[in-house]
C-alpha cells in the first residue's frame, strides 16, 4: 500500500545554516534567538544588530558566538567595544555598520528592525540574493513594488514572517495563482475592539499598550490598537503576493488563532491556525522548506472552545480604510501612509497628540500630498527614502494643527 504522497520525502536542508538577525534585541529578535537557542548545532550566527541596547546585544553576541555585531547608535561604539572585550566578535556602529551586518554572508537573514529604518539593511540582504525572513512590514510598505522587484532581480527569496502573511504563504501552497479568488487576513481587533469612537479618541498610552493576545514591540502594539497594523498588513499582502486591494479582506477574530485564509475558485478555503506566538511563523521561515520543532504551545482547540469572527469597522478604525485608499492611489502613497503613521505614533508616545489624532494626521498628510500632485512610481530605494523623508516633514508640519484641534 502506498500512502498519500506528501510534498518532500527528504529534508531539503542538511548541515549548518548561517543566520543573521537584524533587530536581534527586539521582540521578534528575541523569538528568533529562542528558536536558534533550542537547536544550536543547526545554526552559525553570522551577524546581530540592535539600535541602542549594547548590553543586550553583547550578551547575545557572546552566547551565540556571533562573528559581527552592529549597534545603530553611532555614539555607542566605545561601549560596544568594551562590552565585547576579550572576545573575537567584530563590531561596528551607525547605520553603515547595520547595513554591513546585513550584507555579510548568511544563508538566512531575519529582517526585524522596526520602522522604515529597516529598509536599507533589508535591501542589503536582498541584494546578496539570500533568503530573507521579513518581519519588518514598514520597509515593504515604504518601498512599494520596488522591494519585491529588487528581490526578484537579485534572486533573493522573501519568506513572510508576519503571522498573517506567513499563514497566507502556507495556505497559498495548496493552489495556483489563477485559482485564487481572495485572501483574508485576521485581526484581533486590539484593546479597543468594542470601544465607542469617543472613547477610542481619548485612549491613553497605557491602554493602547495593553494588547489582548500578542506580546510585541511598542510601535506595533500601538498600530494594533489603531488597526494601522492591519492597514500596513493589507499593503504588505498586496506587495508580497502581487494582489489587488479587492483581493484582500480583513476579518476581525478576537482569539488570534486563525491567522490567514485563502479562498480558491472551487470555494475551498484553506487556513493556517496556531497559538498567538510569533515563534510559529518564525519557525516556519527558519526551517523552510523543511519544518523544524517549534517552541510555542500546541494548539488545543477543545480548550479554546470558540473561535469568533466579525467584520472590521472602518469608521471607528479609519486607519484601515486609509490603507486601502493609499494602495488604490499607488505611486508612493503607501510610503506616505507609513511615514505619517510613524510620525503620528511617535507624537502619541510623546503625548503630543491624542490617540484619535493618529489616523487624522495620516489622512491629512495623505490628502495634502495628493493635492500637491507629486505622485510618481518609486524607481529606487533612494526614491522611497526621499519620499519617506518628505512625508515625515509634511506630517511634522501638519502635526501642530492636528494637536491643537479637538476631535
Ligand atoms: P521591537 O521594537 O521590539 O524591536 C525592534 C528592533 O529594531 C530592536 O532590535 C531595535 O533595537 C531595532 N531598531 C529600532 N530602531 C532602529 C533603527 N533606527 N536602526 C536600527 N535598528 C533599530 O519591535 P518588534 O515588535 O520586534 O517588531 C519588529 C518588526 O517586526 C516591526 O516592523 C514589526 O511591525 C514587525 N512585526 C512584529 C511582530 C511582533 O509580534 N512583535 C509581529 C509581526 C511583525
Ligand atoms: Mg501581523
UniProtKB/Swiss-Prot annotation:
Function noted in UniProt: Catalyzes the NADPH-dependent rearrangement and reduction of 1-deoxy-D-xylulose-5-phosphate (DXP) to 2-C-methyl-D-erythritol 4-phosphate (MEP).
Taxonomic classification: Bacteria, Pseudomonadati, Pseudomonadota, Alphaproteobacteria, Hyphomicrobiales
Keyword Manganese: yes
Protein's name in the database: 1-deoxy-D-xylulose 5-phosphate reductoisomerase
Domain of life, source organism: Bacteria
The species this protein was found in: Rhodopseudomonas palustris (strain ATCC BAA-98 / CGA009)
Protein's UniProt keywords contain Transcription regulation: no
InterPro entries named among the record's database cross-references: DXP_reductoisomerase, DXP_reductoisomerase_C, DXP_reductoisomerase_N, DXPR_C, DXPR_C_sf, NAD(P)-bd_dom_sf
Cofactor(s) for this UniProt protein: Mg(2+); Mn(2+)
Annotated residues for binding of Mn(2+): 162, 164, 233
Keyword tags: Isoprene biosynthesis, Manganese, Metal-binding, NADP, Oxidoreductase
